[in-house]
């Protein structure tokens, strides 16, 4: 993702909220029985165009969630939002999870299921059509949605790549 890594975003300056997507209980068999652990996937965002995800693992649920939030704050990206939606349709794939996202007119609402809904809510997108294809594994679906949002080009990026002005981009 050399195009836009989002490394210049300082999460301390943002008012980030978190949303728990999935908790998984894991078991390790030891001599005395089973040791249980937990992992949690958490999406963080300010609902104004910044979103990130994190995975936390611990022996207690609350510790796993806290670690997930900290990890999510390290992975925050900026999403270009135009009138409450995305500028153009995009398809992203991570593993066997595939997420299709299409811009929608104002008033359509957030049409998304499960893990994708959490990512888009935290990003602050209000009108969008999505479809999750392939795997329904929440880890891979979240990563595919984030990858798609990261690959969205706004008008300024397109103009810069084409060495044209914004006006020329919209006229062509």
From Swiss-Prot:
Q: Which InterPro entries match?
A: Ribosomal_Su5_D2-typ_SF, Ribosomal_uS5, Ribosomal_uS5_bac-type, Ribosomal_uS5_C, Ribosomal_uS5_N, Ribosomal_uS5_N_CS, Ribsml_uS5_D2-typ_fold_subgr
Give a Gene Ontology cellular component term annotated to this protein: small ribosomal subunit
In terms of superkingdom, the source organism counts as Bacteria
> Which BP terms does GO give this entry?
translation
Q: Which UniProt keywords apply?
A: Ribonucleoprotein, Ribosomal protein, RNA-binding, rRNA-binding
Domain S5 DRBM: residue ranges: 16-79
Name one matching Pfam family: Ribosomal_S5_C
Show the GO MF annotations. Answer: rRNA binding; structural constituent of ribosome
The record comments on the domains as follows: The N-terminal domain interacts with the head of the 30S subunit; the C-terminal domain interacts with the body and contacts protein S4. The interaction surface between S4 and S5 is involved in control of translational fidelity.
Listed PANTHER family: MITOCHONDRIAL RIBOSOMAL PROTEIN S5
Family according to the record: Belongs to the universal ribosomal protein uS5 family.
Q: What is known about what this protein does?
A: With S4 and S12 plays an important role in translational accuracy. Located at the back of the 30S subunit body where it stabilizes the conformation of the head with respect to the body.
Quaternary assembly: Part of the 30S ribosomal subunit. Contacts proteins S4 and S8.
Please give the name of this protein. Answer: Small ribosomal subunit protein uS5
Organism from which the protein derives: Chlorobaculum tepidum (strain ATCC 49652 / DSM 12025 / NBRC 103806 / TLS)
What's the source species' lineage?
Bacteria, Pseudomonadati, Chlorobiota, Chlorobiia, Chlorobiales
- The protein's gene is named rpsE
